[in-house]
């Protein structure tokens, strides 16, 4: 677990109900009933995204039979990243991972307070509800999905939409940092506060 605060000397992240829990998982496919989780990572930020701390990054063991059922895209992507080898070498189960993540999160945010934050996060939530239900219940029922802003930008401000280039590394921790960076990008360019009443340019 590493402090990823950008500014030297910044205060540590204080436990607060307004802190945001960012999560990403890599899976063997898209169907939570037949596919499995193979990697999970979390990052907790303060509400303004200025201070952050990384949590556990865990490859989750799955059988060779489960890995063999992956389609070519998943085999190629997770093979190139080294994740398949990490999954085979791991002894961490889904229950182990859920317990480690929950213990880390409890140090930084009270249960039931943070929405689940990320990109297309409803998909992660579906898998978590299926395979890590106790961890899923740690979160508030709401989601903070950066994909919502992405889709609105694509329709309303296409130039801004095209300005953020994703690296598409498809590892859980890298994807989380990219989601946080993407939200900062939209905050600066798309979510522009209105001028106070009576203020003129």
From Swiss-Prot:
Exonuclease domain boundaries: 20-183
Localisation: Cytoplasm
Record-linked SUPFAM superfamilies: Ribonuclease H-like
Active-site residues, record numbering mapped to chain: 141
Primary localization class, coarse: cytoplasm
Gene Ontology CC entries for this record: cytoplasm
GO biological process terms on file: DNA metabolic process
GO molecular function, one term: 3'-5'-RNA exonuclease activity
Pfam families noted in UniProt: RNase_T
Entry keywords, A to Z: Cytoplasm, Exonuclease, Hydrolase, Nuclease
Keyword Cytoplasm: yes
First-level EC class: hydrolase
EC number: 3.1.15.-
Keyword Hydrolase in annotation: yes
InterPro entries given in the database record: Exonuclease_RNaseT/DNA_pol3 (IPR013520), Oligoribonuclease (IPR022894), RNaseH-like_sf (IPR012337), RNaseH_sf (IPR036397)
HAMAP family: Oligoribonuclease
Protein family: Belongs to the oligoribonuclease family.
Function: 3'-to-5' exoribonuclease specific for small oligoribonucleotides.
Name this protein carries in UniProt: Oligoribonuclease
Organism encoding this protein: Burkholderia mallei (strain ATCC 23344)
């Amino acid at each position: 677990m590493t402090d990823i605060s950008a500014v030297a000397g910044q205060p540590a992240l204080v436990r607060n109900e307004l802190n945001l829990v960012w999560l990403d998982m890599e899976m063997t496919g898209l169907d939570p009933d037949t596919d499995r989780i193979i990697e999970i990572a979390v990052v907790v930020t303060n509400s303004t995204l200025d201070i952050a701390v990384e949590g556990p990054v865990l490859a989750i063991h799955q059988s060779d039979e489960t890995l063999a059922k992956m389609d070519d895209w998943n085999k190629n992507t997770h093979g190139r990243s080294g994740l398949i080898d990490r999954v085979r070498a791991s002894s961490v189960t889904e229950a182990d991972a859920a317990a480690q993540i929950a213990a880390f999160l409890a140090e930084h945010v009270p249960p039931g307070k943070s929405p689940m934050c990320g990109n297309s996060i409803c998909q992660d939530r579906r898998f978590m509800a299926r395979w890590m239900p106790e961890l899923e219940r740690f979160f508030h029922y709401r989601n903070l999905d950066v994909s919502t802003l992405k889709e609105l930008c694509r329709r309303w401000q296409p130039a801004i939409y095209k300005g953020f280039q994703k690296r598409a590394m498809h590892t859980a921790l890298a994807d989380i940092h990219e989601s946080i960076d993407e939200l900062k990008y939209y905050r600066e360019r798309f979510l522009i506060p209105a001028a106070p009443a009576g203020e003129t340019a």
